[in-house]
């Protein structure tokens, strides 16, 4: 399992130290919020540029914004590995995905918990990652929504049919209690914020998620 600690849960007063504490992660997950699509504001390109100078871990950028193409053009020069946009609020998602891809970045598509998985069927050939929100977007520290496990299975079947190389990622409430179920549901990458950053040994917490084991009965 690949693991992406969410910087939304980090202490920004000590960001360099926080990033070093999760340096064994596969990605760093960056939530960009504009205060319109979701009721919260987070980091912009200046902070993200600083992050790239602090770490060699690939960046996984999640745009929770309106007018995603504007933000893609802001963040693409920083060379994140992934930029994901929401399917729900884009009039022309294929156009934005192509913009991301033309920048040499893996495009991703995001679904909120209650958005039907069939809505992305015709976009799957244009993406390298599908991100399923397992909480309502906007704030960290929320409880995992179990209904997303069934959705993972359905999306994985769509991926197998339309784009087998596409990764499946889940974001929200991920911890050591549900990681095995997520792996069984076909998830390739998990985003975890509060669980990792509230752990005494963050590197060990990441390793525990990476090396998934069936929980004892």
Curated annotation (Swiss-Prot):
Cofactor binding, note field: Binds 1 divalent metal cation per subunit.
Recorded catalytic activity of this chain's protein: D-ribulose 5-phosphate = D-xylulose 5-phosphate
Enzyme class: isomerase
EC annotation from Swiss-Prot or TrEMBL: 5.1.3.1
Keyword ATP-binding part of the UniProt annotation: no
Pfam families to which the protein is assigned, alphabetical: Ribul_P_3_epim (PF00834)
Molecular function terms from GO: D-ribulose-phosphate 3-epimerase activity; metal ion binding
Binding of substrate, residues: 6, 62, 138-141, 171-173, 193-194
Binding site for a divalent metal cation: 29, 31, 62, 171
Function: Catalyzes the reversible epimerization of D-ribulose 5-phosphate to D-xylulose 5-phosphate.
Homology family: Belongs to the ribulose-phosphate 3-epimerase family.
Name of the protein in question: Ribulose-phosphate 3-epimerase
Organism the protein comes from: Helicobacter pylori (strain J99 / ATCC 700824)
Gene name of the encoded protein: rpe
């Amino acid at each position: 399992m690949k693991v992406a600690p969410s910087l939304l849960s980090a202490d920004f007063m000590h960001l360099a130290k926080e990033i070093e504490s999760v340096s064994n992660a596969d990605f760093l997950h960056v939530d960009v919020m504009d205060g319109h699509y979701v009721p919260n504001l987070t980091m912009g390109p200046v902070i993200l540029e600083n992050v790239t100078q602090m770490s060699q871990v690939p960046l996984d950028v999640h745009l929770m914004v309106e007018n995603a193409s504007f933000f893609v053009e802001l963040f693409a020069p920083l060379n994140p590995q992934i930029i994901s946009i929401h399917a729900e609020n884009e009039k022309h998602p294929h156009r934005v995905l192509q913009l991301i891809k033309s920048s040499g970045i893996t495009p991703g598509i995001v679904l909120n918990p209650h958005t039907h998985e069939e809505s992305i069927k015709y976009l799957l050939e244009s993406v390298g990652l599908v991100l399923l929100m397992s909480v309502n977007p906007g704030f960290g520290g929320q409880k995992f929504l179990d209904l997303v496990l069934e959705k993972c299975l359905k999306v994985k079947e769509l991926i197998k049919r339309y784009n087998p190389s596409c990764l499946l990622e889940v974001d929200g409430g991920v911890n050591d209690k549900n990681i095995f179920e997520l792996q069984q549901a076909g998830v390739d990458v998990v985003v975890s914020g509060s669980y990792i950053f509230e752990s005494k040994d963050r590197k060990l917490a990441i390793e525990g998620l990476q090396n998934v084991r069936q929980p004892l009965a």
